[in-house]
Amino acid sequence: MAEKRAEKRKFNTEAWEPKTQIGRMVKEGTISDISYIMDKGLPLLEPEIVDALLPDLEEQVLDVKLVQRMHKSGRRARYRATVVVGNKNGYVGVGMGKSKEVGPAIRKAIAHAKLSLIKVRVGCGSWECGCGSPHSIPFTAKGACGSVKVELLPAPRGVGLVAGNVAKAVLGLAGVKDAWTKTFGDTRTTYNFAEATFDALNNLNFVRCLPNQKEKLGLTEGRVL
């Protein structure tokens, strides 16, 4: 499922009725850049905010599984969908949704992924390259979810994404073009694998750099182009 092509959806801003103050400011045009919301630490409570500010966002279904849980009346089955969204230019999110039907489960996962959207730091942290362009990640990062642990390493230009299909989908929609990965644990669990990769990308944002280091690494946050 991870190799399914990403899709874009058109969003009608005029038909949208915001429920939050930030949503109303976005519709009125007071806020026109999603990085402003993230830099201020404002909460993303409506997926439509992401649709309005990132019209080039793509969605990719990584996995749909039938899961069961025991109840006093017997086994209850639901579908669990794992989705990644991103614009291939510095923004990415991962989400999961559950429902009795496949369609609603995917829609819930898409909404969850949009609300978990983060800015991604890109750069050139490989000692083999040093070109200073934002094609890889600026430094090594680690992430974990459940039993799965993922380590991302900068790679020189042209290597591509040396990763499993799930991690490759997350990194690709984040805008990372070259990277090496190390994985530990049960990576067959799609959501944990995707979330661990997402966690590693998010951890890049907590590393402090001096201005001269940022220039050397070609470090860029959010949109590159």
UniProtKB/Swiss-Prot annotation:
The keyword Ribonucleoprotein applies. Residues 57-120 form the S5 DRBM domain. Belongs to the universal ribosomal protein uS5 family. The N-terminal domain interacts with the head of the 30S subunit; the C-terminal domain interacts with the body and contacts protein S4. The interaction surface between S4 and S5 is involved in control of translational fidelity. GO terms for molecular function: rRNA binding; structural constituent of ribosome. The lineage of its organism: Archaea, Methanobacteriati, Methanobacteriota, Methanomada group, Methanococci. GO terms for cellular component: cytosolic small ribosomal subunit. The gene is rps5. This is Small ribosomal subunit protein uS5. HAMAP family: Ribosomal_uS5_A.
